[in-house]
């Protein structure tokens, strides 16, 4: 966005590590996780910085523009990635005139106006401000849970399932005062996970900002999504297809530029009989081709092809997958590059041997799951 940057603050984005979405073929770098067809977690993190008018430091920019900080070697958690990013920033950047650094972890989605968080950080004299994400009702997966006092001060950190008392999670997003960075790095040596935050709270003024109290220009509320399971990842994207999605992808006051790509626009064509393609309450990315067929309440990623006679309902179709003629799909996730054969039925009755039915009612179609039979009777991967 044009305009003067938020005074005294710079922001960096940190790559993430793989997690519960590995079955879907999501890259080991979770920052590249596709979302809403046209985005990656990485793009949405940079949109938060840009819309908040937070500049990125010169050390994290190149000819292509702002770049995310690579993760540390090995599979470090959120705290390890944040600490490595601060270590690199403090050793390779000039932070003269900068009082605060915002760190966003790109293994989830957080759309919040960082200017509001910065104001709270300053007004309460915080050294570190953690973005606390309210856990959606019914989610029980363990995560880093925060307990804060009435003054926002951090009281307790633990790796656990959410409770009625502690229902704010931390996914790796924070603001830190530059004066506190040396103490943050020194205090965290030899610690990992939740113990890092516990040590910091013993030595510094650490507060928690409940993002449910935050807002976005044009809509009045912040947005967050932490993909703790395949089911939560699916549900978040089905919500975006609804009439009142939690995140407005078309808010002119908070623009969300799509990931760069080289595909042409989507094309809704006719089938062999002249019947038009229909996509109702869908998110349709660049390069999608529908040759007739019908899609409802679904996300169609880049380069997806839907052949004539196919029907897709409540589905997540990831980049480059192919839905064959007359195939019927309901409540399915078709992973990137996968091929659903002509006439296949997914999510209706018997699950084909090349798909995986889950207890939640979802069906996954992924290359490593799909085994078909060739004409000579030998087993082969369909679409692999």
Regions found by a protein language model. Name each.
Residues 1-15, 188-384:
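Left-handed beta-helix
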Residues 1-241, 354, 359-361, 365, ...:
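Unchanged
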């Amino acid at each position: 966005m044009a305009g003067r940057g938020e005074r005294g603050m710079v922001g960096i984005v940190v790559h993430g590590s793989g997690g519960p979405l590995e079955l879907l073929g999501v890259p080991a770098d979770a920052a590249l996780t596709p979302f809403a067809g046209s985005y990656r977690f990485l793009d949405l993190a940079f949109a938060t910085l840009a819309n908040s008018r937070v500049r990125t430091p010169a050390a994290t920019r190149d000819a292509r523009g702002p770049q995310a900080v690579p993760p540390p070697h090995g599979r470090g958690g959120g705290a390890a990635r944040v600490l490595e990013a601060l270590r690199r920033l403090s050793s390779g950047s000039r932070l003269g005139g900068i009082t605060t650094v915002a760190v966003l972890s790109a293994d989830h989605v957080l759309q919040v106006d960082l200017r509001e968080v910065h104001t709270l950080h300053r007004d309460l004299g915080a050294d570190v401000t953690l973005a606390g994400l309210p856990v959606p009702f019914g989610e029980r997966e363990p995560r880093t849970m925060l307990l804060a006092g009435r003054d926002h001060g951090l009281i307790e950190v633990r790796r656990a399932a959410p409770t009625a008392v502690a229902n704010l999670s931390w996914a790796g997003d924070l603001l830190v005062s530059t004066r506190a960075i040396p103490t943050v790095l020194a205090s965290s040596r030899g610690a990992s996970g939740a113990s890092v935050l516990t040590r910091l709270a013993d030595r510094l003024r650490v507060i928690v900002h409940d993002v449910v109290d935050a807002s976005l220009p044009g809509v009045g509320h912040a947005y967050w999504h932490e993909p703790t399971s395949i089911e939560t990842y699916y549900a978040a994207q089905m919500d975006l297809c609804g009439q009142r999605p939690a995140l407005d992808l078309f808010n002119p006051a908070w623009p969300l530029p799509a990931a760069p790509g080289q595909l042409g626009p989507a094309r809704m064509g006719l089938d062999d009989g002249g019947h038009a393609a229909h996509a109702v309450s869908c998110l349709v990315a660049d390069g999608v081709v529908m040759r007739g067929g019908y899609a409802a309440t679904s996300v169609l990623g880049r380069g997806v092809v839907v052949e004539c006679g196919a029907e897709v309902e409540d589905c997540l179709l990831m980049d480059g997958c192919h839905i064959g003629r007359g195939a019927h799909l309901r409540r399915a996730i078709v992973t990137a590059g996968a091929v659903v054969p002509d006439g296949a039925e997914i999510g209706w009755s018997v699950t084909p041997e090349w798909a995986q039915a889950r207890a939640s009612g979802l069906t996954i179609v992924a290359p490593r799951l799909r085994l078909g039979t060739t004409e000579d009777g030998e087993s082969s991967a369909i679409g692999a």
